[in-house]
Amino acid sequence: PHVLQLSTHEHAWVFQLHDPECRAVAADLLSRQGMAKAGFGLGDDRKRIIEKLGVEPAEILELNAVFRAQGYRKDMGVKGAVAVLFNQRFQKSKKAATSNWASERLSESQLVYAANDAYAAYRVWDALGL
């Protein structure tokens, strides 16, 4: 991955992993015990994190698996989860989604996209009471 985004209720962080300082902080956060990290579509990311950051991610929760365990048959992404849990539509910019995430400097729209994505996953995790 080129970018790692994390969120709490109050703050969101977007780490560009080409930057050595960002990589070091991201590696520390991802490998830290006692801190849950949750998201959607994390299967491939785990392998790439190990390769790129040299750490084994700890306490990672694939939210799609939670929905599957609750009986949902189809994959549940963040948009579907927001619809199910909050009865709201979560819009994601196709332009930002398909933009160059390896860029030296992310645009404001990319930062907003990444932060919103992380915050939405946090809200889903929180609403599920996990």
Model-derived features with residue positions:
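Conserved DEDDh/DEDDy metal-dependent 3′-5′ exonuclease domain
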Residues: P1-A127
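Short arginine-rich
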Residues: L130
